[in-house]
């Protein structure tokens, strides 16, 4: 009997070349010299790690190579699996979706017995089985004489960090503005075309009966629609329930799964995962090093900084996500610590008024519920300003599309290449240097020939930035008021009496209570 550990990394994550993700850290922490039990490990780079920058960009955006990655992980398991082996699956981001898809592959088709088979034979059989995965009603006819293990392998543990949609484009219904409607329509069209050319909607990301234990670390604070999380539906309707915990951590997507250079915050989610794993043998001092490196007050990066501002803006709706997945909202105790310390003025925007606090060791804080008559008002204010910021994003998108359309027209109707040295100024020279040739005609007209245009554009852009900053401050102000309600509750204080709990959780409800905190309610604000 041996342990087989399969690891799949996130988009753009390449172990040893990019800052370490939690998946790569765990892969490196496995003791491959262990003989009791024997352990073997497979690591798969994330999509979007090719050497060619254009292929890398397309793969990162559209998930090219995902199907091959799923086959590679399945093939490795098929080649090395013996009955009674323990299988462990780990992934981050799209790699988390990949690992979950591999488990769905096993559930749909079983596991091919690849022992003693040549590379080509096994690859061909896995490709054939993938077709069965896509069309399960025809399983027996398509599999033919491929030898399948009598029973699917039991998955001892599946651990994932912030699973996001692997292929296609997450759709949101609260679209603001013409630009966003056009973008939504375009992405829906591209998604349908991509599914027709490279079918992907057949992948099964659900929990299956062969899984013994499952853990999912999720990001509280990411604001990108493209990184919308795939939360497990915990209502599996199976006679044998899965031991599953899905826990929310402070920070953006890569603050939870790793990949930023300053990794203190992501190490908190890494440590939580390590302390939930049973049966694996790690290298000496792995747990101690993880404890030393974890920093709940570490830096939270801005996931929409720079050109990333063009990611569709949509903070995560924690309550709705958990309700749809038939699970309660579980927040890691490190979030409460960060709130209590007010680190970098941290205040999550869409925490529900009732949630469960959970720690690494199964210890809970026995606290009375805390009442807030102002919670609904503060929450309403946050949602109103979030809606306004979505509208601002729509304006930005429409203005950008307008510039691109005008540039396309001017560039396509130009009689010849522009002699930028004939008539120019310092501003134009800088713009010529930093922008593609595609924009030369537009720059000449708006900066050199009629500079009033660049002056007007500068004023409009400055106003946009100012309004955006005001909206951000307003959203943050309401979030800070919600934070004040939380940190005034006994649950947020480390010296409050604690007690053990079988599931390591305790409920915090801000809707009922013994004595409400005194907090000034803000007046209703209009946009």
What are these regions (language model features)?
Residues 1-527:
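Active-site- or binding-pocket-proximal scaffold segments within functional domains
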């Amino acid at each position: 009997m041996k342990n087989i550990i399969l690891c799949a990394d996130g988009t753009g994550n390449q172990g040893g070349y990019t800052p370490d993700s939690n998946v790569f850290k765990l892969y490196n922490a496995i003791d491959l010299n262990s003989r009791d039990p024997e352990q073997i490990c497979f690591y798969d780079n994330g999509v979007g790690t090719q050497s060619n920058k254009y292929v890398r960009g397309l793969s990162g955006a559209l998930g090219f190579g995902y199907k091959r990655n799923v086959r590679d992980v399945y093939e490795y398991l098929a080649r090395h699996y013996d009955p009674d082996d323990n299988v462990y699956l780990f992934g981050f981001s799209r790699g988390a979706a990949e690992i979950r898809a591999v488990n769905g592959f096993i559930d749909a088709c079983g596991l091919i017995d690849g022992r003693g088979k040549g590379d080509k034979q096994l690859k061909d059989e896995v490709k054939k089985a993938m077709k069965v995965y896509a069309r399960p009603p025809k399983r027996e006819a398509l599999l033919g004489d491929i030898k399948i293990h009598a029973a699917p392998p039991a998955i001892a543990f599946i651990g994932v960090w912030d699973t996001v949609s692997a292929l296609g484009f997450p759709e949101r219904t609260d679209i603001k503005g013409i630009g966003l409607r056009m973008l939504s329509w375009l992405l829906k069209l591209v998604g349908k075309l991509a599914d027709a050319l490279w079918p992907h909607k057949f992948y099964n990301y659900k929990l299956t009966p062969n899984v013994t234990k499952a853990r999912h670390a999720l990001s509280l604070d990411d604001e990108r629609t493209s990184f919308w999380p795939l939360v497990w539906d915990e209502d599996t309707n199976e006679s044998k329930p899965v031991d599953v915990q899905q826990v929310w951590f402070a920070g953006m997507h890569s603050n939870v799964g790793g990949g930023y250079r300053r990794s203190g915050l992501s190490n908190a989610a890494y440590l939580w995962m390590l302390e939930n794993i049973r049966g694996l043998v790690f290298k000496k001092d792995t747990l101690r090093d993880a404890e030393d490196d974890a920093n709940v007050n570490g830096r939270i990066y801005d996931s929409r900084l720079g050109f990333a501002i063009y990611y569709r803006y949509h903070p995560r709706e924690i309550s709705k996500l958990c309700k749809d997945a038939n699970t309660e909202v579980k927040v890691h105790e490190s979030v409460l610590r960060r709130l209590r310390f007010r680190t970098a003025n941290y205040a999550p925007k869409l925490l529900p008024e009732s949630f469960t606090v959970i720690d690494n060791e199964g210890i809970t804080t026995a606290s009375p519920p805390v009442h807030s008559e102002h919670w609904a008002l503060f929450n309403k204010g946050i949602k109103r300003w979030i809606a306004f910021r979505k509208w601002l994003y729509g304006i930005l998108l429409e203005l950008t599309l307008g510039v691109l359309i005008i540039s396309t027209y001017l560039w396509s109707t130009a009689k010849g290449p522009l002699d930028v040295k004939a008539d120019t100024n310092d501003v134009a020279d800088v713009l010529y240097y930093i922008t593609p040739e595609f924009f030369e005609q537009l720059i000449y007209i708006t900066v050199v020939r009629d500079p009033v245009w660049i002056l007007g554009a500068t004023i409009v852009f400055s106003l946009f930035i100012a309004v955006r900053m005001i909206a951000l401050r307003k959203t943050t102000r309401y979030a800070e008021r919600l934070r004040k309600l939380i940190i005034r509750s006994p649950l947020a204080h480390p010296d409050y009496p604690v007690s053990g709990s079988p599931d390591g959780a305790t409920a915090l409800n801000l809707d009922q209570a013994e004595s409400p905190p005194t907090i000034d309610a803000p007046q209703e604000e209009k946009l």
